[in-house]
Amino acid sequence: MSDKTVKSTNLMAFVATKMLERQEDLDTCTEMQVEKMKTSTKARLRTESSFAPRTWEDAIKDEILRRSVDTSSLNKWPELKQELENVSDALKADSLWLPMKSLSLYSRVSNQEPSSIPIGEMKHQILTRLKLICSRLEKLDLNLSKAVLGIQNSEDLILIIYNRDICKNTILMIKSLCNSLI
């Protein structure tokens, strides 16, 4: 009778050992998934850094460097703007003058000066970038939700849930910003 007890104990120990090995395999797979997510996130951040927001001053400086323009041509722009503001009231009231004024504000004075981006184009560029960021955040949220399924460690689980909440809130903020720009 003791022989049967030994066999059942050995069988239970064998099953317990196999379960522990399987758990270790699952933990390893989860760690590998988290590492893959980290590396892909770092790669995305590197590619998204090319879309870093720039100020108008930076854009103008880049345009000047690209075209090798001296800064004296930039000094003409405030003078031209001042001349437009000094136009007589009779011309300002004329309905034909208003479209010409708005066109002249966005037109180039010479081939050497950087042009301003019209509001429509700028808004389109901003919306395009925000939609790209939003789609990448949604993909990250999906990957985080998949990673939650395999995690057994409570600290990692809490961290992933926290990051998903941040991700969802950021997506909502970007979508509301897009709606306000439209």
Swiss-Prot record:
Mediates the nuclear export of encapsidated genomic RNAs (ribonucleoproteins, RNPs). Acts as an adapter between viral RNPs complexes and the nuclear export machinery of the cell. Possesses no intrinsic RNA-binding activity, but includes a C-terminal M1-binding domain. This domain is believed to allow recognition of RNPs bound to the protein M1. It is found in: Virion; Host nucleus. Changing residue 103 to A: 90% loss of nuclear export. The keyword Transport applies. The lineage of its organism: Viruses, Riboviria, Orthornavirae, Negarnaviricota, Polyploviricotina. GO terms for cellular component: host cell nucleus; virion component. Keywords: Host nucleus, Host-virus interaction, Transport, Virion. Interacts with protein M1. May interact with host nucleoporin RAB/HRB and exportin XPO1/CRM1. Disulfide bonds: none annotated. Belongs to the influenza viruses NEP family. This is Nuclear export protein. Its main location: virion. Pfam families: Flu_C_NS2. One of its GO terms (biological process) is exit of virus from host cell nucleus through nuclear pore. Changing residue 132 to A: 90% loss of nuclear export. A motif (Nuclear export signal) lies at residues 96-105, 122-132. InterPro entries: Flu_C_NS2, Flu_NS2.
